[in-house]
From Swiss-Prot:
InterPro entries named among the record's database cross-references: Aminoacid_DH-like_N_sf, NAD(P)-bd_dom_sf, THF_DH/CycHdrlase, THF_DH/CycHdrlase_cat_dom, THF_DH/CycHdrlase_CS, THF_DH/CycHdrlase_NAD-bd_dom
Gene Ontology molecular function: methenyltetrahydrofolate cyclohydrolase activity; methylenetetrahydrofolate dehydrogenase (NADP+) activity
Family: Belongs to the tetrahydrofolate dehydrogenase/cyclohydrolase family.
Protein name as catalogued: Bifunctional protein FolD
Subunit structure, interactors included: Homodimer.
Lineage of producing organism: Bacteria, Pseudomonadati, Pseudomonadota, Gammaproteobacteria, Enterobacterales
Binding site for NADP(+): 166-168, 232
Length: 287
């Protein structure tokens, strides 16, 4: 079976051009550009880099991005007040609170305070519930970015046994819902799962998101499996690697995502696509 490295950067570039074309058309009609509000709490270096990347991408496709940065000791009520104002700001179509959020702030409370139609990260209970009910609106960016990538490469996953390693609210749980929606038989594993190798060895498709460098070895993977690596880990030497031991997993897999350049770009482009979708819905509602 032909081995392929799934190039998220290349797909994202194509989708970026498509979004820019749509935005330019809207502007030619005299409409305002889409607007994304980004809130950063604390000074996490990785978060700062991610925010810069997202804002840069906004500019590339003609979006307006507005940015608020707060110290990690900010009162939760002040963030909630800002979100309340942004919910009713007619120039803002999407609201993003960059993760991770300091432990003194209830992240679920923040996600729930964003109105569902501006929840471009897809974490509001309404949007998660809609995904579970098989009628998704704004979908969590990383899981849907992965589905978009698989579709782009025309990889058929209906009927496959998919194993998700990691059960976070951000990736693992919504990923399992996306895979169910796509027709997979889905197993979700977590830190309490006994005999993890047993489940992984049965998988036709593996999605791993646990934040543990080189955790998944090629010896665990059955020949021909599809391997999707969501992990981003920095080694002591500064190298960025995923949760998968790429060299050994590559030998066994049929398709595999690299880190960097795999899932990451798909997450960002899905955020932009969600923002455009929210913008178009708001524009339609205003007519």
């Amino acid at each position: 079976m032909l081995k392929k490295v799934l190039n998220g950067t290349r797909i994202a570039k194509k989708l970026e051009f498509k979004i820019l074309k749509q935005v330019n058309y809207k502007l030619s009609l005299g409409q305002r550009p889409p607007g994304l509000a980004v809130i950063l709490i604390g000074s996490n270096s990785a978060s700062t880099i991610y925010v810069k990347k997202k804002r840069f991408m906004c500019e590339q496709v003609g979006f307006i991005s507005k940015f608020w940065k707060f110290s990690k000791n900010i009162q939760e009520s002040k963030i909630l007040n800002l979100i309340y104002k942004l919910n009713y700001d007619t120039t803002i179509d999407g609201i993003l609170v960059q993760l991770p959020i300091p432990p003194n702030i209830n992240n679920q409370k923040l996600f729930s305070s964003i109105i569902p139609t501006k929840d471009v990260d897809g974490f509001h209970p309404y949007n998660i519930g809609s995904l579970c009910q098989k009628s998704p609106y704004l979908r969590p960016c990383t899981p849907f970015g992965i589905i978009t990538m698989l579709k782009h490469y025309k990889i058929k996953i209906r009927g496959l046994h998919a194993v998700v390693i990691g059960a976070s609210n951000i990736v693992g749980r919504p990923m399992s819902m996306e895979l169910l929606l796509a027709g997979c038989t889905t197993t979700i594993t977590h830190r309490f799962t006994k005999n993890l190798k047993h489940y992984v060895k049965q998988a036709d498709l593996i999605v791993i998101a646990i934040g543990h460098a080189h955790f998944l070895k090629g010896t665990w993977i059955k020949k021909g499996a599809i391997v999707i690596d969501v992990g981003i880990n920095r080694l002591k030497n500064g190298e960025i690697v995923g949760d998968v031991d790429f060299k050994t997993a590559y030998k066994k897999s049929s398709y595999i995502t690299p880190v960097p350049g795999g899932v990451g770009p798909m997450t960002v482009i899905t955020l932009l696509n969600n923002t455009l979708k929210a913008y178009e819905q708001i524009s339609k509602d205003c007519k």
